[in-house]
Structures are given as structure tokens and as C-alpha cells.
From Swiss-Prot:
The keyword Cytoplasm applies. The gene is fdhD. Its main location: cytoplasm. Disulfide bonds: none annotated. This is Sulfur carrier protein FdhD. Pfam families: FdhD-NarQ. GO terms for cellular component: cytoplasm. Mo-bis(molybdopterin guanine dinucleotide) binds at F260, C261, K262, P263, G264, R265. Belongs to the FdhD family. Gene3D superfamilies: 3.10.20.10, Cytidine Deaminase, domain 2.
Length: 277
């Protein structure tokens, strides 16, 4: 490999989650070039020494991912149930080693499932079909949002995708205040993982992140709705469409679900009473 190519590779590795590889363009199959590609690695969540789940994810913000996954899957009730966390390399990927309280670990062992995930898959490894759409405590109606504030947020969603800007290969999830300001966001090759990262961070931000809604760059699947509801999110905006099961779960748990969010337009699937225009 040429020295200039090697230097470019060294530079790009400063951006977590991106790697440069050789590839060929359709108009020039004789001469390879370097381009940025998003990294996807197996990430195992290990609770008190026992591996619970393996997900394919971007290798960044994994502490937030582990916290958000633990909350959105009902493994913990609050961040206080986790006593410690370390991200360590393993032979085939990364491990997030999590120390749970004894009470929460006993609960986890009682319902433990073996799950080997595809990219951001939230269903793989569910033992029974009845486990899909598990009951979620109905949400209160404490949040409101003016749809006129949505356009500005949509324009800035890409700001939270530095890997996506280079590779075109990530989803984003961001927290949107009632003013339309995006105060924080995360990206990942898996849309569910991006959401878990955001939910994990939100759980640590306190009151400043309690008022508002989630905005995601992807479609809204039932897992996205269920994870949001499990973490007390009342309004979920998605850039793409929603599935029928997502709508059913949102209706049942009192979540306001909005899809096809583009400048000047939005489709409200459930509970429009939280919204104004």
C-alpha cells in the first residue's frame, strides 16, 4: 500500500466508528480508491459475568447503549440499579461488563433469554411469540408539542451523525425540546441501538431532558415504540413510516406516534391530543 494511502487510513481512525477501505467505482474498475465505511462490531452485554445479549453496533457510546438497553428491556428500573460498567475488547468484538444489583440480577436470571442479534435487531431470541408486544404501563398525558417547531429539528438531525455524514450508513436518534431544539443525539448502524444510546443518556441528564420528544431518522417499528414507552417517552417522531404493530402498541400504551416527518408535513398515527399546529 502506498504511504499516502496508509496516512489517510491513520487519520480517519481518529473518528470512532469509521474505517477506510479500498474499493472500486463503476466507472473505473482498474484503479482502486480509498473511501470511508462505517464499522459494525459484535457487542456483548454481560451482566454479573453472564452474557445476556449480542448486538451488532457501532463501537462508540457503548456505555449509553448498555444503560438504555437495560432500561428499555426492563432489566433495570433506574441507573441506580447498575453499580459499575466497563467496555473491554474480546476476541471477536467488544464486551460491556455490567454489575447489577442483586435484586435486578435475580430478576434477570428468572427471565433470561439467549439472543444473538443482527444489526439492531430487537426481536431476535424472543422465546415466545406472546413476548412480542409485552405490556407497558400506559403513559400519562403530560407532554405537548407544536408541529411548527419540527422543521428546524429536522434540519439539524444530521449534525448528530458524523459517521453517517462520511459513510451514509448510520441512523440517528435525538432528544427534541418543546422549542424544537435538539439538545443531544446518538448514531449507530442499528436504529434500535441508536435509540437505546439516546435513552441511556436521557436517563442521566435529569430534568433538562424530561420535557420533549424523541426524533429518529428511521422508520418506527414496534420495538422503537416499546423501548420509548418503557423509558417514559410520550412522543416519538420518525422520518419514515410506522408499521401496523408499532401503531397498535403506541395506541395501547398512550404514546403519540408521528411518521413521515419532513419539512412542512407529518403523519400522526396515534393520540394527536398532545400536538398542536
Amino acid at each position: 500500500m502506498k504511504k499516502t494511502q496508509q496516512k489517510e487510513i491513520e487519520n480517519v481512525t481518529n473518528i470512532t466508528g469509521v474505517r477506510q477501505i479500498e474499493l472500486w467505482r463503476h466507472d473505473d474498475l482498474q484503479h482502486p480508491r480509498l473511501d470511508e465505511v462505517a464499522e459494525e462490531v459484535p457487542v456483548a452485554l454481560v451482566y454479573n459475568g453472564i452474557s445476556h445479549v449480542v448486538m451488532m453496533a457501532s463501537p462508540k457510546d457503548l456505555e449509553y447503549f448498555a444503560l438504555g438497553f437495560s432500561l428499555s428491556e426492563g432489566i433495570i428500573e433506574s441507573p441506580r440499579d447498575i453499580f459499575g460498567m466497563d467496555v473491554v475488547p474480546s476476541c471477536n468484538g467488544l464486551e460491556v461488563q455490567i454489575e447489577l444489583s442483586s435484586r435486578r440480577f435475580m430478576g434477570l436470571k428468572e427471565r433470561r433469554r439467549a439472543l444473538a442479534g443482527r444489526t439492531g435487531c430487537g426481536v431476535c431470541g424472543v422465546e415466545q411469540l406472546n413476548d412480542i408486544g409485552k405490556p407497558v404501563q400506559p403513559l400519562p398525558f403530560t407532554q405537548t408539542f407544536d408541529l411548527n417547531k419540527l422543521d428546524d429539528a429536522l434540519r439539524h438531525l444530521n449534525d448528530f451523525q458524523p459517521v453517517g455524514q462520511l459513510t451514509g450508513c448510520t441512523h440517528a436518534a435525538a432528544w427534541m425540546l418543546p422549542s424544537g431544539e435538539l439538545v443531544g443525539g446518538h448514531e449507530d448502524v442499528g436504529r434500535h441501538v441508536a435509540l437505546d444510546k439516546l435513552l441511556g443518556r436521557r436517563s442521566q441528564e435529569g430534568e433538562s431532558w424530561q420535557q420533549g420528544a424523541v426524533l429518529v431518522s428511521s422508520r418506527a417499528s414496534y420495538e422503537m415504540v416499546q423501548k420509548s414507552a418503557m423509558c417514559g417517552v410520550e412522543i416519538l417522531f420518525a422520518v419514515s413510516a410506522a408499521t401496523t404493530l408499532a401503531v397498535e402498541v403506541a395506541e395501547r400504551c398512550n404514546l403519540t406516534l408521528v411518521g413521515f416527518c419532513k419539512p412542512g408535513r407529518a403523519t400522526v398515527y396515534t393520540h394527536p391530543q398532545r400536538l398542536s399546529n
